[in-house]
């Protein structure tokens, strides 16, 4: 696989988001043994940039990755997160906690579950509006000084927040949702208003061009959900999801919104047909085309999709392709 640079370390141009192996998507398809095998196969393919977080199965996902990396830890760049916790009612509404005490305690818990002595990339999952960013980020910087974390990142932040943190300790990565139906992080309008999990906690303000900020400041940008939570693959045509699948309560997957958003998929399919590729590969390749500093992390639990997603690294979109894709209409419905 082609590689991209993360803080001086080459990683596969396409990473692997591991959340769905433990949380949020189709619980009936979860299989820990199969997921362990898939993670190891990902490493064989050159997919070496792995992403997890404590809330993904309330620690289950981190433990799963720790199991998969036994004997192969040095082959992966491992990212996890702090700052969000699963509430007592185990609902989708994760609770923010950016206190220095929580930041440090959760790092120790993550190290234990992951079975490692150092975290390669430690994100602040969401900024806590009740805790100064400088306090959360300062505690994370102390973990770097202690040798427990190598690099720091932010998730779902604005340009102003990224700059504030960067002035205290270098920001190595910013992770935000970016796909053909969510382009806020690239400075496009829409999609953030009223969300509870966005960069500002639902103020309705846009984040600014975070992708460009990363390029200008030596950070990588990590798009999560580059496949639009599966929608951009062209395989989702109805809003019939399991109770354990959060897409069942996601505004963009309501029947009316879903049908309207199929206009986006039609363009993706047309580009894919020209290249003999799949819609998923085109959607991922579009994120890769946003800059050499961009490393998308599509998630999957299935081998065939792992191989399909990895193949996107070899798909070179033309200027005509990109113009058509950039011209798709904004998605109908809020992100959350």
Annotated model-derived regions:
Residues 1-76:
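N-terminal binding-site loop/beta-alpha segment at the start of enzyme catalytic domains
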Residues 16-18, 52, 121-124, 154, ...:
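Conserved beta-strand positions
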Residues 20-32, 89-102:
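Active-site mouth loops of central-metabolism enzymes
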Residues 29-42, 98-114, 158-164:
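Short, acidic/polar
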Residues 41, 45, 113-114, 147, ...:
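Structural motif
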Residues 66-80, 138, 142, 146:
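Alpha-helix-loop-beta-strand connector modules within alpha/beta enzyme cores
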Residues 111-129:
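Active-site groove signature of glycoside hydrolases
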Residues 127, 133-336:
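Beta/alpha (TIM)-barrel catalytic core signal, keyed to glycine-rich beta->alpha loops juxtaposed to Asp/Glu
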């Amino acid at each position: 696989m082609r590689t991209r640079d993360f803080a001086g370390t080459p990683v596969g141009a396409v990473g692997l988001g591991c959340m769905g192996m433990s949380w949020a998507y189709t619980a009936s398809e979860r299989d820990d043994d199969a997921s362990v095998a898939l993670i190891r196969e990902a490493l064989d393919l050159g997919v070496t940039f792995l992403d997890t977080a404590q809330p993904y199965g309330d620690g289950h996902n981190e433990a799963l990755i720790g199991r998969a990396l036994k004997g192969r830890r040095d082959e992966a760049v491992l990212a996890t997160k702090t700052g969000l916790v699963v509430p007592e009612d185990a609902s989708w509404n994760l609770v923010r906690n950016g206190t220095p005490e929580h930041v440090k305690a959760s790092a120790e818990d993550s190290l234990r579950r992951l079975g490692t002595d150092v975290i390669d990339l430690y994100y602040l999952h969401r900024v806590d509006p009740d805790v100064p960013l400088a306090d959360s980020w300062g505690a994370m910087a102390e973990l770097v000084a202690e040798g427990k974390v190598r690099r720091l990142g932010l998730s779902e932040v604005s340009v102003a927040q990224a700059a504030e943190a960067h002035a205290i300790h270098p920001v190595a990565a910013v992770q935000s949702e970016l796909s053909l139906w969510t382009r806020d992080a690239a400075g496009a309008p829409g999609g953030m208003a009223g969300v509870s999990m966005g960069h500002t906690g639902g103020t309705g303000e846009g984040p600014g061009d975070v992708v460009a900020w990363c390029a200008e400041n030596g950070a990588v940008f990590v798009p999560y959900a580059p496949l639009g939570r599966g929608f951009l693959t062209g395989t989702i045509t109805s809003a019939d999801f399991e109770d354990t699948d959060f897409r069942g309560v996601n505004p963009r997957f309501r029947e009316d919104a879903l049908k309207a958003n199929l206009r986006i998929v039609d363009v993706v399919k047309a580009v894919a047909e020209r290249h003999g590729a799949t819609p998923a590969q085109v959607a991922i390749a579009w994120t890769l085309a946003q800059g050499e500093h961009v490393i998308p992390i599509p998630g999957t639990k299935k081998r065939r999709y792992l191989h399909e997603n990895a193949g996107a690294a070899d798909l070179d979109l033309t200027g005509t392709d990109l113009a058509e894709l950039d011209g798709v209409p904004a998605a109908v419905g809020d992100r959350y």
